[in-house]
Amino acid sequence: MENLSKRFNALQDQLMNIYESAPDTLESQIEHWQTLRKEAVLLYFARQHGISRVGYQPVPVLAVSEAKAKQAIGMVLRLQSLQKSEYGSEPWSLVDASAETFRSPPENHFKKGPISVEVIYDKDKDNANAYTMWRFVYYQDDDDKWHKSASGVNQTGIYFMQGTFRHYYVLFADDASRYSTTGQWEVKVNKETVFAPVTSSTPPDSPGGQADSNASSQTPATTTDSTTRQSPRKQSQQTNTKGRRYGRRPSSRTRRTTQTRQRRRSRSKSKSKSRSRSRSRHRSRSRSRSESPRRRSRYRSRSGSRGRVALRAITTTTTTTTRRAGGGSPTSTSSTTSQRSRQLRGGGRGGSRQRARGRRSSSTSPTPSKRSRGESESVRQHGISPSDVGTAVYTVSSRHTGRLGRLLDEALDPPVILVRGEPNTLKCFRNRAKQRYTGLYKSFSTAWSWVAGDGTERLGRSRMLISFISFSQRKDFDETVKYPKGVDRSFGSFDSL
């Protein structure tokens, strides 16, 4: 107990010295956060051992000490990374390196030089709201390189330049729906009017709306840090548009093709059954009239069974070939079936020859959606050529293939997982997966973002792709890996990678 009190008092003295001297170097800020981390660890240790008070300081619960220690560790790592950059020699005060400043908009960024921005709604000076614009914002790119960017304000909101993009971290339209009745506001910086009153219905440079032709030619691309508030009708329209643009359509082409195939198969089966019934009646009559019923019935039963088996095989082959050609109709399928059924009435050797011909014709036809049995056997024996990897566009079946055959089939349609989140979170997740989950995946991509079709602004959060060798490997990865907080995932596959 006495040792804990002495160590705690020593840490308190170090913190008081830092606060009194108020250094403006990055080394001093790192030392400040290191001292806060030690203090949180000491209080955590005291609480674990049932100590409720260290000197005059009450010991908080374990969750509070743990959160403070983790916060201090995160700030130390970020400040050490910033210290290695070209901006490490700049003056950094306690306020610049504080957690409150780091978490203020734009969140998770270091910033300097606060400037007050006042927005007056409905031309009423009493109906105003104050915002903070930072003169400089420091951010990391996908390669963990630090950049220093200037911040600005316009009639849409407050932003900072991230390369060639305008990254908005304050949007005036968000608060206009709460404080304004007419949807108009006026922007003032240092008590000087910068932009005349504009309406929230058609903001000229809004990230979510259309921009003027003049404004779009003069204003660079924009991206936003928060979602603009719109009417439910507009939100539903945007949601449907995004679903059609980046998602799969509800009535996809594969579903329509599958339904069409089932209808054609049912028609061909019904027609083949009606023909087989008519043939069986004809044969029964001929048997009654014949002189040697036993021999003829045996011969006809054998030839009839062979003919029916061959007829079904050729009917399926003809239907598949017509369906692959894309221009056939049920009428053409039935006519082809009737012609071949006439040739098969003799049964026996003629039927086997026709079956062999049907197999040759079906194997030579193009098969984008389903491979023949001979092709599957050749794939299992000889493997897959590099040019065929990623060419399959159908879901792999687990029947009649075996483990090796399934793996080879899955190689034609490589599965992936798309994760969405903050860039730094995704990069940390990738580095942690490389250390802990080696063998559960094939490869990771870098962090990337979607770009609007009518502009260059980034849409939504950053994304990262994870590729796998097989669907079973993806399943093992998804069940084993713990995804970071705030990271979403979705499954998919590509023709090739």
Swiss-Prot record:
Location (main, coarse): host cell
Species of the source: Human papillomavirus 20
Stated name of the protein: Regulatory protein E2
Gene Ontology, cellular component aspect: host cell nucleus
Domain of life: Viruses
The organism's taxonomic lineage, starting at the top: Viruses, Monodnaviria, Shotokuvirae, Cossaviricota, Papovaviricetes
InterPro entries: E2/EBNA1_C_sf, Nucleotide-bd_a/b_plait_sf, Papillomavirus_E2_C, PPV_E2_N, Reg_prot_E2, Regulatory_protein_E2_N, Regulatory_protein_E2_N_1, Regulatory_protein_E2_N_2
Biased composition (Basic residues): 242-287, 295-305
Gene: E2
The record's account of how the chain is modified after translation: Phosphorylated.
Subcellular locations according to the entry: Host nucleus
Region (DNA-binding domain), start-end ranges: 413-497
